[in-house]
Swiss-Prot record:
Pathway: Cell wall biogenesis; peptidoglycan biosynthesis. The gene is mraY. The keyword Membrane applies. It catalyses: UDP-N-acetyl-alpha-D-muramoyl-L-alanyl-gamma-D-glutamyl-L-lysyl-D-alanyl-D-alanine + di-trans,octa-cis-undecaprenyl phosphate = Mur2Ac(oyl-L-Ala-gamma-D-Glu-L-Lys-D-Ala-D-Ala)-di-trans,octa-cis-undecaprenyl diphosphate + UMP. This is Phospho-N-acetylmuramoyl-pentapeptide-transferase. The keyword tRNA processing does not apply. PANTHER family: PHOSPHO-N-ACETYLMURAMOYL-PENTAPEPTIDE-TRANSFERASE (PTHR22926), PHOSPHO-N-ACETYLMURAMOYL-PENTAPEPTIDE-TRANSFERASE HOMOLOG (PTHR22926:SF5).
Length: 335
């Protein structure tokens, strides 16, 4: 535990020191920043805010993790597990970096196409499966102690899990501080699970990433000086999925990650309902005022009769939801 706390503090300090330089470099180069959605007028003032801040905390977290792992976890099993998780984080970080790079530096509005991004995400999931899952012989989902053996279909599950949650965290990263703190809450919950299982190698990775993310939040809370970009959100979602698999507690991510599930479900429901009503009635209708769900809250709270919610209020509501969900999972597992 001391090692994890020490590593987390170092990650916090290095990220906190590096981030201002990254922001300053971004501004000096006069690089085009984040584009804002016009439907949420309070966001228009953020246009041009530097993005790709995930580059900093990912480089810090992965570098420190490799160093600490090589020094303190020299056995093949721990190194294999740590390498598998870090590799998928790096791969998804690179995918996000390419997407951000095309949007900002090459002025390609959509960045990578949906097909390109999905293909690269599948490749990243396959790498994780080959490096970590196959050598461990895992082919079952653990649900409340009952193991559902899937055989080859477990590969499909791993790909679905990693790709799905990487995109879910990406959707969550829509207002200042929401994704960064939500992921910290999720990681802390998995830190408790890792500690209870004696998985101190995974606990180390969690501690380092939590430290780096808390430092990033110093610059990402409202009003944000920088956004994490796809480079950060895609990598964090993949990391959460990989950790839930590594700890053999896959189902818990549906609850611990309730915020990401809610954000993604809102988009899927909105699109499906809009297409259905357009076909049936000749005009598309909506369930939510705007998706992902955090924008629905911004534009009128839960009931729609309330005044527009501030970003801090939306953040607080969704952070609290994630915290309560995480505590419920821990209570189910250990009480």
């Amino acid at each position: 535990m001391f090692l994890t706390i020490l590593a987390g503090l170092i990650a916090f300090a290095v990220t906190a020191l590096a981030m201002p330089h990254f922001i300053r470099l971004y501004q000096l180069k006069k690089i085009g920043g984040q584009q804002m959605h016009e439907d949420v007028k309070q966001h228009l003032a953020k246009a041009g805010t530097p993005t790709m801040g995930g580059t900093v905390f990912l480089l810090v977290a992965t570098s420190l993790s490799f160093v600490f792992a090589l020094v303190y976890f020299r056995d093949g099993q721990s190194l294999g597990l740590i390498s598998g998780i870090l590799l998928i984080v790096l791969i998804y970080g690179i995918i996000g970096f390419l997407d951000d790079f095309l949007k900002i530096f090459k002025q390609v509005n959509e960045g990578l196409t949906a097909k390109q991004k999905f293909t690269l995400q599948i490749v990243g999931g396959l790498v994780f499966y080959v490096i970590h899952v196959m050598p461990s012989g895992i082919d079952a989902i653990n649900v409340f102690g009952y193991h559902w053996h899937l055989g080859f279909l477990y590969l499909c599950f791993v790909l679905f899990w990693v790709v799905g949650f990487s995109n879910a965290v990406n959707l969550t990263d829509g207002i200042d501080g929401l994704a960064s703190v939500s992921v910290v809450i999720s990681l802390l919950a998995y830190g408790v699970i890792a500690y209870a299982q004696g998985q101190f190698d995974v606990l180390l990775l969690i501690g380092i990433m939590v430290g780096a993310l808390l430092a990033f939040f110093l610059f990402n809370h409202k009003p944000a000086k920088i956004f994490m970009g796809d480079v950060g959100s895609l990598a964090l979602g993949a990391m959460l999925a990989a950790i839930s698999i590594a700890l053999r507690q896959e189902w818990t991510l549906l609850v611990i990650g309730i915020v990401y599930v809610l954000e993604t479900s809102s988009v899927m429901l909105q699109v499906t309902y809009f297409k259905y009503t357009k076909k049936k009635y000749g005009e598309g209708r909506r369930i939510f005022r705007m998706t992902p769900f955090h924008h629905h809250l911004e534009l009128g709270g839960l009931s729609g009769k309330a005044a527009k919610w501030s970003e801090w209020k939306v953040d607080a509501f969704l952070w609290a939801l994630g915290l309560v969900a995480s505590l419920i999972v821990l209570a189910i597992l250990y009480l």
